[in-house]
Swiss-Prot record:
The glycine cleavage system catalyzes the degradation of glycine. The H protein shuttles the methylamine group of glycine from the P protein to the T protein. PANTHER family: GLYCINE CLEAVAGE SYSTEM H PROTEIN, GLYCINE CLEAVAGE SYSTEM H PROTEIN-RELATED. It comes from Parasynechococcus marenigrum (strain WH8102). Residues 24-106 form the Lipoyl-binding domain. This is Glycine cleavage system H protein.
Length: 129
């Protein structure tokens, strides 16, 4: 199965995405990662106001197969979390690049986005396996 990813998204090696929207960045996990996890049953996210370092664990996602940590693709302050995904984890599974987003961050260093893979590079990486 070949995966497609929104062209505006940037991706970390650990399969989290960052999508810049003005001064904020929406964060989630890729459709590829969601597919690998299988049925998602629980999501744990940080609180609004928490500060995250790039690469730091910011929560976890639990599926019937495994529990996986998630890592911040950029550093910043959590300004919003997706309460709908916390209440109904299947939202993440149904639309990981849309309604299944996880966090909105105010990045402390927006240039960190440039170090992430673009959608084409990420797509080539995950579709090659």
């Amino acid at each position: 199965m070949a995966f497609e990813f929104p062209a505006s998204f940037r991706f970390a090696d650990s399969h989290e995405y960052a999508n810049a929207d003005g001064e904020l960045v929406r964060v989630g996990i890729s459709a590829f990662a969601v597919d690998q996890l299988g049925d998602i049953v629980f999501v744990d996210l940080p609180d609004v106001g928490d500060s995250l370092d790039k690469g730091a664990t910011f929560g976890s996602v639990e599926s019937v197969k495994a529990v996986e940590d998630m890592y911040a693709p950029v550093a910043g302050e959590v300004v919003q979390r997706n309460e709908a995904v916390l209440a109904s984890p299947e939202e993440l599974q149904n639309d990981p690049h849309g309604e299944g987003w996880l966090l909105v961050l105010r990045p402390s260093d927006p240039s960190q986005l440039e170090a992430l893979m673009d959608a084409g590079t990420y797509g080539t990486k995950v579709n090659a396996g």
